């Protein structure tokens, strides 16, 4: 899925898989400008610990915009420790109402090991119906592969790695250099 909302810059696949009491978030390392790979080892999945409560976040879109959103999410989490959904809804409200934030071009997947949410560029907070979600240029490929692999007995991390490998084989804006973070509640 090409992201027309982010013209010029392409190249992110972030996938989250929840299974067996843990959530695994995986992201590829490729950043492209047009038809050129600018970097192959970008780290788009981060572990945050605001107020001592661990959260894992993966981002797609503009890196600077994503970092701005991550910083604001950390502040919301400090104000509502251990309440990921509440912090994300508060961030989404700001995102929709603030003139500056409305122009940010990024999406986030966030989890505390129990709650799994997607924050869209439109300021929406979505909880996936299934225990899998994905964003970015290869997100649909990774999502389809992971949903198929959920029918197996594979653990979450293996599902994430296999699905990301499939996405990297299909999407030219996704590579196999993965950052993988696991978190459980």
UniProtKB/Swiss-Prot annotation:
Q: Where is the active site?
A: 12
What is catalyzed by this enzyme? Answer: ATP-dependent cleavage of peptide bonds with broad specificity
Kindly state which keywords UniProt assigns to this record, in alphabetical order.
Allosteric enzyme, Cytoplasm, Hydrolase, Metal-binding, Protease, Sodium, Threonine protease
Q: Which GO terms describe its biological process?
A: proteolysis involved in protein catabolic process
Q: What class of enzyme is it?
A: hydrolase
Which protein family is it in? Belongs to the peptidase T1B family. HslV subfamily.
Under what name is this protein listed? Answer: ATP-dependent protease subunit HslV
């Amino acid at each position: 899925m090409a992201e027309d909302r982010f013209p010029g810059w392409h190249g992110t696949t972030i996938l989250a898989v929840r299974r067996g009491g843990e959530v695994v978030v995986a992201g590829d390392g490729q950043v492209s400008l047009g038809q050129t790979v600018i970097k192959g080892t970008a780290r788009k999945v981060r572990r945050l610990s605001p107020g001592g409560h661990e959260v894992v976040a993966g981002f797609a879109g503009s890196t600077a915009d994503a970092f701005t959103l991550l910083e604001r999410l950390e502040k919301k989490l400090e104000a509502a420790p251990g309440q990921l959904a509440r912090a994300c809804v508060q961030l989404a409200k700001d995102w929709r109402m603030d003139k500056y934030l409305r122009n940010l071009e990024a999406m986030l997947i966030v989890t505390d090991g129990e709650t799994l949410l997607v924050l869209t560029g439109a300021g929406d907070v979505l909880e996936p119906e299934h225990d899998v979600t994905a964003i970015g240029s290869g997100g649909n490929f990774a999502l389809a592969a992971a949903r198929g692999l959920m029918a197996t007995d594979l653990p979450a991390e293996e599902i994430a790695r296999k699905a990301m490998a499939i996405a990297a084989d299909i999407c030219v804006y996704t590579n196999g250099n993965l950052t993988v973070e696991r978190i459980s509640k």
